[in-house]
């Protein structure tokens, strides 16, 4: 399958079995409800002044072309892109590789076809499936990597590590987040801070602040003009394992969570790592929280709960799944951001999907193994951070995570320097601050064919069921057991 994914509430499943054909199936009752052939569909043409015309105009359907930072291209640029198209299509991207996102069970769907070359991969179509027409097209300056949306916002991630945020009611651009530029500016600010602390820079505080402001302004200007190759020419999203991820909550709060580049380490000044996660309120267009070093490795998979209060993460190792409080609650404590931890297994795994159910009682995990795991969030056997009953052994990664999130870990001056008192103090502090090493395993599991890629969906209407769609064209419904064990297959269908 070129595309295989559920919509936000698992009422529909999007399938692209061939290079140019996209189908949408209802999950209950099961059946095909929409189909489009992108190869034979009528093309839209635009004139020189940027307006657009569409063959659907005969039916009085309006079609709009929106550009974001694009301009008229020269012959040399077109020729260069044609060469890039041949390289990318032949060696990296398979023909007909789509980026698709549905808007729940409505008639709106966003489609980007990356398999038709770089130029086509920069164009996002908003399609009305009932009227079978394109409502609008948005042209971006770089290829589209991912699209997420809910009833309030649409967010588009580009290969240039930029996130465009739109008001979905009118497709008005609200904000552009540049992940790589922000990382560069943070690195420059850290360098400046270190230099000022060590006395490398001399002068009063006002002069130092002026130097810092000019430094950040120059970094921003260079990125805009394209004169800073470390900021703007980086193109890794489709070609590297290190790739930014983003997820958007389904409710109207519209909480966006995306991975961010970590500040380079002292021994690796040019290192690039996605260890951090940013929590962003797209409704008010403002950041909410910053989770630092959620994993020791690069964050490879994200999931956010329906209301945006919980965030699940997994690294490129795929052995441990962590659940964090996002910080959108008024009673949020930054020192207690880690909520739960689960161990998927000891064997390394490439995880490509995490998913919460709507009630936030369960989280599903899908990877390139023969098992799909379901973890229970309300399982009392999995001790919370800060539970004084924790008495396991702690590894280095967990200690670093806890000490970073809890700066208060340390020996108070008022404690007498006696060995028993110090040992007792550290024992209590460590037990109250570090998660249990004896992490909970899955509550339920589903055995699948390891050679087939699968995706998972929790239907809102049936809380005790889970949907599984596989590359071999099967759609399966499983019943979640009341006690720990294997899920029971109740129904099986084929995408035909």
Swiss-Prot record:
UniProt entry keywords in alphabetical sequence: Autophagy, Cytoplasm, Phosphoprotein, Protein transport, Repeat, Transport, Vacuole, WD repeat
What are the ranges of the WD repeats? 294-334, 346-385, 448-488
Q: Name one GO biological process term.
A: cytoplasm to vacuole targeting by the Cvt pathway
Q: Where is the composition biased (Low complexity)?
A: 46-57
Q: Does the keyword Endoplasmic reticulum apply?
A: no
Q: Which Gene3D superfamilies match?
A: YVTN repeat-like/Quinoprotein amine dehydrogenase (2.130.10.10)
Give one Pfam family.
Answer: PROPPIN
Record field: compositional bias (Acidic residues): 75-84
Where are the bilayer-spanning segments?
Answer: none
State the compartments where it is located: Cytoplasm; Vacuole
Sites of the modification Phosphothreonine? 213
Q: Please list the GO terms describing molecular function.
A: phosphatidylinositol-3,5-bisphosphate binding; phosphatidylinositol-3-phosphate binding; phosphatidylinositol-4-phosphate binding; protein-macromolecule adaptor activity
Positions bearing Phosphoserine: 237
The record describes the protein's role as:
Required for cytoplasm to vacuole transport (Cvt) vesicles formation and mitophagy. Involved in binding of phosphatidylethanolamine to ATG8 and in recruitment of ATG8 and ATG5 to the pre-autophagosomal structure. Protects ATG8 from ARG4-mediated cleavage. Essential for maturation of proaminopeptidase I.
Q: What is this protein called?
A: Autophagy-related protein 21
